[in-house]
Amino acid sequence: MASEDPSVSGVSGRYATALFELARDEKVIDAVKADLDKFSAMLVESPELLRLVRSPVFGAEAQTKALGAVLDKAGIAGISANFLKLLAANRRLFVVADVIGAYRALVARFKGEATADVTVAETLSDKNLEALKLALKSVTGKDVTLNINVDPAIIGGLVVKLGSRMVDSSIRTKLNSIKHAMKEAG
């Protein structure tokens, strides 16, 4: 299963696949995804937690103990908590973001959905988000979940990555193309 999707490979893919298969067998795929999404948001919001996850200074025992306290406080329990503690015990907590991404990809594939990473210059309105979802659904034939990243550096337009395909209609890219064309011409 892991070899079918490039986003589900390596160490993180193996861990995500094992978690997905366990969650599927226990019929808790969505609950585990919700827990992982909550943990992912916690990583973004807490520099201390991110340091705990990434730093090689903390030993496996210290990471596991600290992580257990964080998970208890966050209300993350069961398979999700045990899995995250296993990553800490095995000194693999630093790949947790990749594991979460791979797990999301496995869930999407299982549900017949696709996930698109969309980079925009400014936040899209709900109307524009729905229009983009419908446009991508017409291309893929699948329900599409959007991961929106706001990057003002693209100036305008958007960059869409869907599986191995990428469409870059950003103003930054268009300006760079014009710049290169002018250099070659002049």
Swiss-Prot record:
Alphabetical list of InterPro entries matching this protein: ATP_synth_OSCP/delta_N_sf, ATPase_OSCP/d_CS, ATPase_OSCP/dsu
Keywords (A to Z) from UniProt: ATP synthesis, Cell inner membrane, Cell membrane, CF(1), Hydrogen ion transport, Ion transport, Membrane, Transport
Gene3D superfamilies linked: N-terminal domain of the delta subunit of the F1F0-ATP synthase
Cell compartment(s), UniProt: Cell inner membrane
Membrane topology note: Peripheral membrane protein
GO cellular component: plasma membrane; proton-transporting ATP synthase complex
GO molecular-function term, one example from the UniProt record: proton-transporting ATP synthase activity, rotational mechanism
Entry similarity comment: Belongs to the ATPase delta chain family.
Protein purpose: F(1)F(0) ATP synthase produces ATP from ADP in the presence of a proton or sodium gradient. F-type ATPases consist of two structural domains, F(1) containing the extramembraneous catalytic core and F(0) containing the membrane proton channel, linked together by a central stalk and a peripheral stalk. During catalysis, ATP synthesis in the catalytic domain of F(1) is coupled via a rotary mechanism of the central stalk subunits to proton translocation.
Subunit (UniProt): F-type ATPases have 2 components, F(1) - the catalytic core - and F(0) - the membrane proton channel. F(1) has five subunits: alpha(3), beta(3), gamma(1), delta(1), epsilon(1). CF(0) has four main subunits: a(1), b(1), b'(1) and c(10-14). The alpha and beta chains form an alternating ring which encloses part of the gamma chain. F(1) is attached to F(0) by a central stalk formed by the gamma and epsilon chains, while a peripheral stalk is formed by the delta, b and b' chains.
Protein name: ATP synthase subunit delta
Originating species: Rhodopseudomonas palustris (strain BisB5)
